[in-house]
């Protein structure tokens, strides 16, 4: 299981480095979608079935629609891949070397500090009629988002509305 997680982590880093090395929008979108799929697999590996499914359906579904539309609008006759030019290949290799250097630098410190700790199981216990039971943390996360993070949902909805309004105003024309 450790090898699977290590392989998925390497694929995730390579996907994001491949996206950030600025190839053609078609290949950049492909790298981002592949990185999203690998991220879903990492979440599933940690036991987050609900969160992995939500991320796969909503996040990747939306990304495929957006990247399909933008790739159709920015189509090139000869799209630039990661190996077609020296600059893009150099950016990709430098990004990978920096990522490996960062991992080696972090591994040099012998400890990892946990910033958030859940020491109380009271948040995850459900009290029913005569007994009590536990709820999985990923399925209660959606309820916690709308309960404790309702301001975040409002801000995210308002941001999406303003973004759509700005795009409509820009593309409307006179």
UniProtKB/Swiss-Prot annotation:
The membrane-topology field of this record reads: Multi-pass membrane protein
**What GO MF annotations does this protein's record show?**
NADH dehydrogenase (ubiquinone) activity
* Nucleotide-binding found in the keyword field: no
Transmembrane parts of this sequence: 1-21, 24-44, 47-67, 86-106, 151-171
Q: Where in the cell is it found?
A: Mitochondrion inner membrane
Q: Name one Pfam family in it.
A: Oxidored_q3
Q: Which GO biological process entries does UniProt record here?
A: mitochondrial electron transport, NADH to ubiquinone; mitochondrial respiratory chain complex I assembly
Q: Which InterPro entries match?
A: ComplexI_Subunit6 (IPR050269), NADH_UbQ/plastoQ_OxRdtase_su6 (IPR001457)
Record GO cellular component, one term: mitochondrial inner membrane
Q: Does the keyword Transferase apply?
A: no
Q: What does this protein do?
A: Core subunit of the mitochondrial membrane respiratory chain NADH dehydrogenase (Complex I) which catalyzes electron transfer from NADH through the respiratory chain, using ubiquinone as an electron acceptor. Essential for the catalytic activity and assembly of complex I.
Subunit: Core subunit of respiratory chain NADH dehydrogenase (Complex I) which is composed of 45 different subunits.
- PANTHER family given in the database record: NADH UBIQUINONE OXIDOREDUCTASE SUBUNIT ND6, NADH-UBIQUINONE OXIDOREDUCTASE CHAIN 6
The name under which this protein is listed is: NADH-ubiquinone oxidoreductase chain 6
Which organism is the protein's source? Answer: Papio hamadryas (Hamadryas baboon)
């Amino acid at each position: 299981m450790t090898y699977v997680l290590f392989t998925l982590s390497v694929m995730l880093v390579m996907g994001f480095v491949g996206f950030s090395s600025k190839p053609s929008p078609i290949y950049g979108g492909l790298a981002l979608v592949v990185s999203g799929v690998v991220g879903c697999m990492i979440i599933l590996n940690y036991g987050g079935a609900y969160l992995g499914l939500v991320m796969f359906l909503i996040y990747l579904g939306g990304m495929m629609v957006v990247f399909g539309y933008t790739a159709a609008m920015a189509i090139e006759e000869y799209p630039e891949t990661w190996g077609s030019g020296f600059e893009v290949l150099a950016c990709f290799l430098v990004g990978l070397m920096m990522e490996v250097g960062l991992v080696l630098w972090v591994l040099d410190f012998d400890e990892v500090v946990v910033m958030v700790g859940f020491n109380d199981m009271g948040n995850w216990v459900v009290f029913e009629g005569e007994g009590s039971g536990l709820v999985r943390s990923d399925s209660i996360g959606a309820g916690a988002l709308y309960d404790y993070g309702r301001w975040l949902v409002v801000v995210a909805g308002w941001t999406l509305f303003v973004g759509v309004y700005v795009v409509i105003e820009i593309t409307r024309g006179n």
